[in-house]
A protein has these predicted regions:
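Predominantly a Rossmann-like dinucleotide-binding segment in NAD(P)-dependent oxidoreductases
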Residues: 132, 139-232, 286, 377
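Beta-loop-alpha module in the N-terminal Rossmann-like domain of NAD(P)-dependent dehydrogenases
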Residues: 59-125
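A short helix->loop->beta-strand "cap" motif at the edges of active sites that frequently abuts
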Residues: 57-58, 102-104, 129-131, 248
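N-terminal Rossmann-like dinucleotide-binding module
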Residues: 1-55
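C-terminal glycine/acidic-rich active-site capping loop/insertion
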Residues: 212, 239, 244, 273-354
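Glycine-rich, aromatic-lined ligand/substrate-binding cores of catalytic
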Residues: 202-284
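Hydrophobic residues in well-ordered beta-strands that form the structural core
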Residues: 108, 133-135, 278
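C-terminal helix-rich "cap/oligomerization" subdomain common to oxidoreductases
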Residues: 1-4, 333-385
Length: 385
């Protein structure tokens, strides 16, 4: 196969936020082209979106079930190779399940499902079908996050003792859903978002970042979950104490009522030799701190970075790289892995470095454990899956 991968999309219609981000990211490296979509539960909106994206109307579908049924009848090379699912949380599992069962590989926006049970079922289907699966935890795509991961993997800062990860936003400080704002309305609705609000929306990103960078797994939690805004049905703020499988302790907080904050996700990790710090709002910089010497400043695009980080840099040092490029790294790695798989060849080094179903299951377990802990009077709870 010497061609671009054909991508279909479920969700991401006009006025949606994340669908356009996925399309731009998928397009950045030239390995993927959008060929079809079921962009909305409203057939007219789906059709209008297809027109805006210059798609043939015969490849714009009223439902995702129609799309999967029709696309699999087309010859390989013309039909979609994989589908990107960018719907609200309650519409993740069924499209992903049906796509896999119809022979399509899947890229899925997080969280992986509506419940932990659904996530486990999805894993069974992936294993049964042998199809490829990517979960878009965006922040693992940043080059300096990967540099932090490599520094820890090589034991440069020693045995990990403390992990702090935070994700403050401020956009839900007021009762925005009461005004009918689209993003706020579904994200604060238990029927569409699930049992968690902020902890499901951004807490899962912080949790995934902590486990990805450190290479550790959370084993115990103690959560304090709060709803600050009157009338809101789900949590908008929370703090979680963490215990890791090497004995390290940590803290995670995720809030969407920190007035004035934007998307300030940040991680600090401390070992017995040194520590490191990265934050998305200065994404090209990684601080490495030492017990007995000055702080070192690592910059994206520099020649001294690890091979893993360098593979995920796109521009020379000093040229900003950000959210879209991090997203694109996930799509690029998935695409090159899938092309190699389809050609029965070996994928380029580092291309397997993207989140999958295991990260999805742990993310859903995080949500369910945190909400259970927040409702409990117990000091600590085991992190159960």
């Amino acid at each position: 196969m010497n061609r671009k991968l054909n991508m279909g999309m479920v969700g991401g219609g006009k006025d949606a936020f994340i669908g356009a981000v996925h399309r731009m990211a998928a397009n950045l490296d030239g390995h993927i082209q959008l060929v079809c979509g079921a962009f909305s539960s409203n057939p007219t909106k789906s059709s209008d979106t297809g027109k805006e994206l210059y798609l043939a109307q015969s490849r714009v579908y009223a439902t995702y079930t129609d799309m999967f049924a029709q696309e699999k009848l087309l010859p390989i090379g013309e039909r979609m190779d994989f589908v990107s699912i960018v719907t609200p949380n309650h519409l993740h599992f069924e499209p992903a399940k049906l796509a896999l069962e119809n022979g399509f590989d899947v890229v899925l926006d997080k969280p992986v499902a509506f419940t932990l049970a659904e996530a486990k079922t999805l894993k069974e289907i992936i294993n049964k079908t042998g199809k490829s699966f990517c979960l878009t935890h965006t922040y693992t795509g940043y080059p300096m996050v990967k540099e932090a991961k490599e520094i820890i993997r090589e034991n440069k800062i020693g045995t990990i003792k403390k992990v702090y990860v935070s994700y403050p936003q401020g956009w839900l400080t007021t009762f925005l859903e009461g005004d009918g704002q689209k993003q706020a309305t579904w994200r604060t609705d238990p029927a569409k978002s699930g049992i968690a609000g902020s902890m499901g929306d951004i807490g899962t990103h912080a949790f995934n970042l902590a486990e990805y960078v450190t290479g550790l797994q959370v084993t115990k939690i103690c959560a304090d979950i709060t709803t600050n805004v009157a009338g809101r049905k789900l949590d908008d703020d929370g703090t979680v104490l963490l215990k890791f499988n090497n004995g390290a302790s940590g803290m995670l907080y995720a809030t969407q009522v920190a007035a004035g904050e934007e998307n300030n996700i940040r991680i600090q990790v401390y070992g017995d030799k040194g520590g490191l710090e990265w934050k998305q709002e200065d994404a090209n910089t990684l601080l490495v701190k030492w017990l007995d010497k000055p702080v070192e400043i690592y910059r994206a695009g520099s020649s001294y970075l690890s091979p893993l980080a360098s593979f995920n840099c796109r521009t020379p040092a000093g040229h900003p790289e950000g959210y879209l490029e991090a997203f694109a790294n996930l799509y690029r790695n998935f695409a090159l892995s899938l092309i190699a798989k389809n050609n029965s060849t070996e994928a380029p080094e580092f291309c397997s470095d993207y989140p999958g179903i295991e990260e999805g299951i742990r993310g859903m377990a995080f949500i369910e454990n945190v909400i259970a802990s927040g409702k409990s009077n117990d000091k600590w709870m085991d992190f159960s899956i």
